[in-house]
Amino acid sequence: MSSADKNLSSYSGEIPNLSSRVFGIVVAEWNEEITEPLYEGAVEVLLKHGIPKANIIRTNVPGTFELSLGAQWLAMKKGVDAVICLGCVIQGETRHFDFICNAVSIGITEVNLKFNKPVIFGVLTTDNKEQAFDRAGGKHGNKGDEAAITALKMLAQTI
């Protein structure tokens, strides 16, 4: 089922106490009107699950392409247990969209494997701004929420 048919921000299941864990969130500044609500959604979920605000570290990068390096910097920090990458790439008239989406998805995967830590892909890849807004707190939920839930669930597997 595609996310166009379902709001995926609701979930079920227990998440154990992870209040001692530290979460890094790297946020792309490009398309800030989209990425900021993604960030707010992710933080709200982490706080709701008992993660202290002091255990949430934010790093901004200029664009989605830079998320991989920002994630690596956070993953290298002593004490960071998981990293959430938040960005938005909107299809334009050129192939730039394809190159950025491909590079960032591979880059984030490589950081996951290199540091053996959850590095979560919270990047919207949409055809237009309306689709992006729909997934940044709109009718299809907030993918920032979902990225935080994924980080929590992945860390829960380590205890």
Swiss-Prot record:
InterPro entries: LS (IPR034964), LS/RS (IPR002180), LS/RS_sf (IPR036467). CDD domains: Lumazine_synthase-I. GO terms for molecular function: 6,7-dimethyl-8-ribityllumazine synthase activity. Coiled coil: none annotated. 5-amino-6-(D-ribitylamino)uracil binds at W30, T64, F65, E66, C88, V89, I90, F121. PANTHER family: 6,7-DIMETHYL-8-RIBITYLLUMAZINE SYNTHASE, 6,7-DIMETHYL-8-RIBITYLLUMAZINE SYNTHASE DMRL SYNTHASE LUMAZINE SYNTHASE. Catalyzes the formation of 6,7-dimethyl-8-ribityllumazine by condensation of 5-amino-6-(D-ribitylamino)uracil with 3,4-dihydroxy-2-butanone 4-phosphate. This is the penultimate step in the biosynthesis of riboflavin. Pathway: Cofactor biosynthesis; riboflavin biosynthesis; riboflavin from 2-hydroxy-3-oxobutyl phosphate and 5-amino-6-(D-ribitylamino)uracil: step 1/2. It comes from Cytophaga hutchinsonii (strain ATCC 33406 / DSM 1761 / CIP 103989 / NBRC 15051 / NCIMB 9469 / D465). Belongs to the DMRL synthase family. (2S)-2-hydroxy-3-oxobutyl phosphate binds at E93, T94, R135. Pfam families: DMRL_synthase. It catalyses: (2S)-2-hydroxy-3-oxobutyl phosphate + 5-amino-6-(D-ribitylamino)uracil = 6,7-dimethyl-8-(1-D-ribityl)lumazine + phosphate + 2 H2O + H(+). It comes from the Bacteria. This is 6,7-dimethyl-8-ribityllumazine synthase. GO terms for cellular component: cytosol; riboflavin synthase complex. The keyword Transferase applies. The keyword Acyltransferase does not apply. The active site is at H96 (proton donor). Its EC number is 2.5.1.78. It is an enzyme of class 2 (transferase). Keywords: Riboflavin biosynthesis, Transferase. One of its GO terms (biological process) is riboflavin biosynthetic process.
